[in-house]
Regions:
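Cysteine-nucleophile amide-bond enzymes
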Residues: 1-167, 174-185, 191-349
Length: 349
């Protein structure tokens, strides 16, 4: 019976059902995070993560590394995540990605399950290097088996839902000497939604490598359209600002149409990611935005190592089985307590 149960739980249909639950949990999590206007990007602060005037302890966190490089929940895991849902916190986008991943687990398990199924150490946040030396369920000692698919070659063959919840990043291709804005050398994301057309495009082209080459084309074409304004390409290519477009000469208009044709690809329009503090937007927005921030280098897109369909999947399955076992035991207890001692000899009416 145990082998049969394991086979069912490891069946593709069960994994598919889990993927839909995970996707819904991801969307709930990032909605909470992006709706908190007090969760902001790093500014002038004393540590890597800043908990404002109230401090970390008052918002449910305990520091274990100096300069704000490592925190874990003090008591209630769910209460600690509330700091990012409703409190005042500052962090860069790497921590934002960690928080989105952990918040997804909170939404998936529910508050009670999130508190019971994970230890504080497993929910550590901080620099990525810090997490490797902890029990972090994301990157530390308890992460277990990782799925490595940087260019999404395998994931792109599994359908749109296989992407949702997966962590990744957009990073500069040339070395750091080509960066003008070090704070935008990379963007860390969690995939929130993938349209059918975007999934089909990724499957057809075999993942992200094709789009890294497209990013290079976009970057080359954009050189001819550079001009004044901090958000020039964001306005031209994402907002499609008619007034700004009208200032371009005929040759630039032709180049703009070429750029827009490239960015109208379903992947750029329908592959939506959450990036702190920008919220959920199509990946094409980030490609356009980074043309403004670091115009001297193209960018590439990768998924990071993750355990959504290995360790975290089985952790969730174990929790569901525990709940079923507890419910069955409770029902049996109620039945036993409700059965009179004389029931076996007949009952009186």
């Amino acid at each position: 019976r145990g082998a049969a149960l394991t086979a069912v739980l490891d069946d593709a249909a069960t994994h598919c059902a889990y993927a839909f639950e995970l996707g819904a949990a991801t969307r709930r999590a990032v909605t909470q995070l992006q709706n908190n206007s007090h969760y902001r990007f790093s500014a002038v602060q004393l540590g890597w993560i800043g908990f404002g005037w109230r401090g970390a302890a008052a918002q449910g966190w305990r520091g274990f590394r100096s300069f704000g490089r490592g925190y874990q929940p003090r008591s209630s895991n769910a209460q600690a995540l509330d700091a990012f849902y409703r409190g005042q916190v500052r962090s860069e986008c790497g921590v934002g990605r960690q928080v989105a991943q952990l918040a997804t687990q909170r939404e998936l398990f529910g508050d009670a399950g999130f508190n019971e199924a994970f230890t504080p150490g497993e929910l550590s946040i901080g620099t990525f290097l810090t997490l490797h030396d902890t029990d972090s369920i994301l990157l530390g000692a308890h992460a277990g088996e990782f799925f490595a698919d940087g260019k999404a070659v395998q994931t792109s063959q599994l359908g749109r839902q296989a992407f949702v919840g997966a962590p990744g990043f957009i990073a500069h291709v040339f070395d750091k000497s080509y960066l003008d804005d070090i704070h935008n050398q990379a963007e860390n994301f969690v995939v929130v939604d993938v349209s059918d057309a975007a999934a089909q495009a990724l499957a057809q082209h075999g993942g992200f490598a094709y789009y890294d080459a497209r990013n290079r084309q976009i970057w080359e074409l954009a050189k001819q359209l550079r001009g004044p304004g901090k958000r020039r390409f964001e306005r031209l290519l994402y907002e499609r600002d008619a007034a700004l477009r009208a200032t371009l000469d005929p040759q630039q208009q032709t180049q703009l149409r070429q750029l827009q044709t490239l960015l109208d690809d379903p992947f750029y329009q329908g592959f939506s990611v959450y990036v702190h503090p920008k919220g959920t937007k199509p990946i094409g927005y980030h490609v356009a935005r980074l043309l403004d921030r670091n115009p001297r280098t193209p960018y590439a897109i990768d998924l990071t190592l993750h355990n959504l369909r290995t360790t975290l999947y089985w952790r969730w399955i174990d929790w569901q089985l525990q709940r079923c076992g507890a419910a069955t035991a409770a029902e049996q207890s109620i039945e036993n307590s409700a059965t009179p001692a004389y029931a076996g000899r007949g009952t009186l009416h």
